[in-house]
């Protein structure tokens, strides 16, 4: 059943990619559930995912970063809940940078321990998708079909450093850590989009992505269900590690 959900996400990604190629949308006079200003294409991408996922008999509900409430399907006894960010990094569209979609497939409950599969889509020069279950598999859309490029694996030591958040608000200990990475020869690679930045680290073999709690956002800004848990799951399947600085991400409560 999870394969059916993933196939549906692939088809939705194709539709969203086509929208992005002809996008002329602007900002709406509204914000999403996280308080971010919405673009018209954010809302349209959300509609595409919602409509296609709620038609599946195996999906009980969907939980979108763009909406306040969980949306339930008519399949009340179905096992899976899909949480997703339909268009992560959409503020980069006007710069013509890569953006993405993020998803997590949960069994029964919205908690990290119930995550059965996760992944993301990259809308860039090529359309790509990474899906993690037992391993994290890398796909690219070529000649009108999805090609499996193989499993992604992180090296023992990377060279990319992607630190997010406003530097002047970083805590001293985080600033010291980032400076120590640069002193070790790590290279700065940060676009402001979670999907392209984390994807680059995987493709290039390793590194560190961080978006810490700051003085102006003491709880951090990343959302667990739609962003943090799915990417933590992917990275662990690639041989990496995800932490909040105290404990493993996939042991955290929602």
Predicted regions and their residues:
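IMPase-like, lithium-sensitive Mg2+-dependent phosphomonoesterase catalytic core
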Residues: 1-22, 31-32, 37, 43-254
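Alpha-helical coupling/stalk and coiled-coil linker elements that connect catalytic or binding modules
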Residues: 27-28
